[in-house]
Amino acid sequence: MVEYMLFICSDPTAPEYVAAEDNIVEWVSEMEARGVARHGDRLRPIEDATTVTVRAGELLVSDGPFAETKEWIAGYDIISCANLDEAVEVASKHPMARFGKIEIRPVWPLGL
């Protein structure tokens, strides 16, 4: 099994979000029953972000995300799947696939 991180992203070009159609509880239940869901959660809005940078030994802390963008990461899920095809199938069932974008990345273990 391969662990994948799903970045749940907003998409200003997608249909407007409809809370009544957000069946995240059903999706989580289905993925837990299948044994693929590991962990996930929402993220606070970008206004609550803090960016930390260290350059030449100097700490720089700034409010907001690291990039100016209309898209933002709204949440994440970590899943465990047999392969990328299964991860794509799992992501395609996520409610936010209809209202945003889901980026899938394989986790690259540090091996510690």
Placement of each model-derived feature along the sequence:
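Conserved, structured core segments of small domains
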Residues: 1-112
